[in-house]
Amino acid sequence: MKTLFSRLITVIACFFIFSAAWFCLWSISLHLVERPDMAVLLFPFGLRLGLMLQCPRGYWPVLLGAEWLLIYWLTQAVGLTHFPLLMIGSLLTLLPVALISRYRHQRDWRTLLLQGAALTAAALLQSLPWLWHGKESWNALLLTLTGGLTLAPICLVFWHYLANNTWLPLGPSLVSQPINWRGRHLVWYLLLFVISLWLQLGLPDELSRFTPFCLALPIIALAWHYGWQGALIATLMNAIALIASQTWRDHPVDLLLSLLVQSLTGLLLGAGIQRLRELNQSLQKELARNQHLAERLLETEESVRRDVARELHDDIGQTITAIRTQAGIVQRLAADNASVKQSGQLIEQLSLGVYDAVRRLLGRLRPRQLDDLTLEQAIRSLMREMELEGRGIVSHLEWRIDESALSENQRVTLFRVCQEGLNNIVKHADASAVTLQGWQQDERLMLVIEDDGSGLPPGSGQQGFGLTGMRERVTALGGTLHISCLHGTRVSVSLPQRYV
């Protein structure tokens, strides 16, 4: 019972609100076309069609009933001469509206174009009964197209706003909250409206022919900032400016054509902007997905490297230790046999060589410093191991990166860039000084390695000496790696910060 009463109140409110809005728009339309029956085909038609495109089918009888009652009342009051044609036309418009009603809740560019097509079809059907009235049929078609494309998209904007926001009942907790007027948006709308009105009223007569082209400026500006909603709001502002300009009084058809063209421009431009935004969002999602997959691949690679390094260290290390032990036993047991003793010493030396080679391989597979040290300490340890001072290279490390903000992939990548950069400096740069800096800037991690050497060898470009692999790792983490060879070599790395 309570639900039925609530539905009844809703229907009654819908009936009276629609009736009041319909009559007001009919009065405005009558001011423009000066014929009561033709005025019904302008803005009242656009209002009814716009609401029917958005609301559930259960409210269609309310809208049609209210319109028919108003048309009947106007027939009695002012003598509408084509009451049957208006009734038949309104029934015919139900067909395209019913066909696309299932898509009304979708908010993509196809929906805008579908509703635009439905508006055009409904306008044709509404004017179809006027086909046998000669010139009036073209006037009816122009009026329905203009009214439908002017008001129906605005209904879509308001319906989208009302349906996509969470509305809470006004209570004590909400009364004390300040109202967000969004002053910047209001000023922006008002400024564009004033400019549009000035273009209609303030341009000299010799430039008046360019006035219709100026109507596109607010549409483009609002569409760029606010998408399809902005484009449709701009068409409403242009319509108000055109009607208020009073320049159409001697040529009402020109006004209708201007309203039709700018409304069609707003609808198509809004659909295009919406399409671009949807493509951009889809591209961003794919980029984020690829970024996530690349990071997962790096994690998997480092996990495999770590496992392989551990297995090599445990198995080969134990085997080499056993070989050295057995070689020592052979040397002691065959102390009198010089050739056997020499072979034992050779085996021990070869095992030490294998151990050193495996140790270097393990260092490339997985930097052992990162297992026990912080990143800064690991880089300092790396610089000591490379014996930069002994090679005549003065080194300086300045590190201002909070390691708690680094993921494991970032730690390994930064260390490997330092490792590869220092290795290239030692082997190829012929440098006397190297500076390594790391810091955080604007939610990004910055790393710079500079030397005063001869730069990269001719012909190597920026791809050799392991730099390609480093660039791929940095790119996989969403960063960039740049190399410049002016007065030495400068390797710059920038990574997006990840909070751990």
From Swiss-Prot:
Annotated catalysed reactions: ATP + protein L-histidine = ADP + protein N-phospho-L-histidine
Residue intervals annotated with topology Cytoplasmic: 274-500
Residues with Phosphohistidine modification: 313
Post-translational modification: Autophosphorylated.
Topology of the protein relative to the lipid bilayer: Multi-pass membrane protein
GO BP annotation list: signal transduction
GO terms of molecular function: ATP binding; phosphoprotein phosphatase activity; phosphorelay sensor kinase activity; protein dimerization activity
Highest taxon in the source lineage: Bacteria
Database matches in PROSITE patterns: HIS_KIN
NCBIfam families to which the protein is assigned, alphabetical: PRK11644.1
Protein's job: Part of the UhpABC signaling cascade that controls the expression of the hexose phosphate transporter UhpT. UhpB functions as a membrane-associated protein kinase that autophosphorylates in response to interaction with UhpC, and subsequently transfers its phosphate group to the response regulator UhpA. Can also dephosphorylate UhpA.
Protein name: Signal transduction histidine-protein kinase/phosphatase UhpB
UniProt organism field: Escherichia coli (strain K12)
Annotated gene: uhpB
